[in-house]
Regions:
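Hydrophobic Val/Ile/Leu positions in short beta-strands of Rossmann-like dinucleotide-binding domains
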Residues: 278-280
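N-terminal Rossmann-fold NAD(P) dinucleotide-binding loop
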Residues: 287-288
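Structured beta-strand/loop patches that form or line metal/cofactor-binding pockets in enzymes
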Residues: 86-117
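Aromatic pocket-lining residues of Rossmann-like dinucleotide-binding sites
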Residues: 294
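Glycine-rich Rossmann-fold phosphate-binding loop(s) that bind the pyrophosphate
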Residues: 283
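Glycine/serine-rich phosphate-binding loop and adjoining beta1-alpha1 elements at the start
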Residues: 140, 159-274
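Short, positively charged and aromatic/hydrophobic N-terminal segments
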Residues: 2-12, 16, 23, 30-38
Length: 296
């Protein structure tokens, strides 16, 4: 396998890539970065976390998005595990990188020409330590198991920061709503929910919108859920106002980003947004409303 190596000062070199390279002496005091399968992997300066990552890599071969997310989180946890050996003893880190449940299912639907199309659906229920799973449903051709696991893994930490009792999960499909008629999107969403409804519920798993899944798609899914389960419960967030949705739901993520950033600036530097240069990536709901709030 081809890879490139970069050496940086003041770190330890470790062995990767099926033991092609051996651990080197501490005298070298360098860190190895291997570009492998599209992911830059840096050696973690903690033997326990290195072993955790190696197990994750072995269980999830080729899943570069998920592996990169796990690596970044493990890297940030180095000072935590050094101060809290009890977390290591209890196997907390080993457990948090492994999903509690992974669901993959077929989604057949009929297009406007009467032809049957088949997509793949996913729901990863990653961690429910503090509450029911919570995370969006992404509809995009790039969706695969690796992407959904990466998003679900990060959702654990995002949700825990809210202070609310909600766990982390994520779902989606490789269906592309772009260029599809309303009827085609509706039939896909109904088929998707016909299977997904077996695995979600107000006290179990509460999906939401994401890329490709707006109020229209959530509405179709919610209608199918009600039809099958005969329940009008809070099983999906992101619904329209006329059937149980929340005010300012569309703007909430972008606004929240600015509020959070404002508090961080205030906490760390005792400053405000005034006079700051703001760089925003993208042009979706988050970027648009973050731009709006930042200019205010």
């Amino acid at each position: 396998m081809k890879f490139c190596i970069l050496l940086l000062a003041n770190c330890k070199i470790v062995c990767y890539n099926k033991k092609v390279m051996c651990g080197m002496s501490k005298k070298s005091r360098a860190q190895i970065i291997i570009y492998k399968m599209g992911v830059l992997i840096m050696a973690l300066n903690n033997a326990y976390l290195e072993s955790v990552y190696e197990k994750v890599e072995k269980r999830n071969p080729g899943e570069k998005e998920f592996l990169q997310a796990v690596y970044e989180v493990l890297e940030s946890l180095i000072p935590v595990v050094e101060k809290r050996p009890d977390l290591v003893e209890a196997g907390i880190i080993d457990r948090i990188v492994e999903p509690e449940r992974q669901i993959i299912f077929r989604v057949p639907w009929v297009d406007d020409n009467g032809k049957v199309q088949v997509n793949r659906g996913f729901r990863v229920q990653f961690n429910s330590a503090i509450g029911p799973y919570k995370g969006g449903i992404r509809l995009h051709p790039s969706v695969c198991a690796s992407v959904i696991k990466f998003l679900g893994f990060e959702q654990i930490f995002k949700n825990s920061l809210t202070g609310l009792p909600i766990g982390g999960g994520k779902g989606g499909s490789d269906f592309d709503p772009k260029g599809k008629s309303d009827g085609e999107v509706m039939r896909f969403c109904q088929s998707f929910m016909t299977e997904l409804c077996k695995h979600i519920g107000a006290d179990t798993d509460v999906p939401a919108g994401d890329i490709g899944t707006g109020a229209r798609e959530i509405g179709y899914m919610f209608g199918q859920y009600k039809r099958i389960r005969n329940e009008f419960t809070g099983v999906l967030t992101g619904k329209g106002l006329s059937y149980g949705g929340s005010l300012a739901r569309t703007e909430a993520t972008g606004y929240g980003l600015c509020y959070y950033t404002s508090e961080m600036i205030k906490c760390m530097k005792n400053e405000t947004f005034a006079g700051k240069t703001v760089v925003i990536s993208g042009s979706g709901n988050v970027a648009i409303y973050a731009t709006q709030k930042a200019t205010e």
